[in-house]
């Protein structure tokens, strides 16, 4: 748009693409702009619900930092694999955040319970991992096992999503533990 605006003259006019290429370009532009907005809303909602659930800003930060790291690493993996942010890939990062906060809810709720009963941070963490760590590990591995087979799909989108989802499920699990 900027190029057409800056370089069009009375004798020569640059028009934006039409047909499939134009629609794809316009869609990509909207998706690119929507990606950051979507992540902002997702993280605001997760922050709000963590604050309500845990009643602790520290616990909220502990839950959010691994999720944000996973989002950044997922986007880096997408760049490395040559996967663009498209309408079909846009929800993947949000899904990873939703699954990741689930792991954090399991562990932090038990840890905070033990801390409120007077346990030290280290002992409360050990108790939380002993009590719910196996469940978090089982859920993470089960979710990853459900999509890891997609990696060998002849459908490129499905194979790419298999890699991304497997990565996000396992990385979020490790981040929570």
Feature-to-residue mapping (PLM):
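Cytosolic juxtamembrane regions of multi-pass inner-membrane proteins
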Residues: 95-138, 146, 150
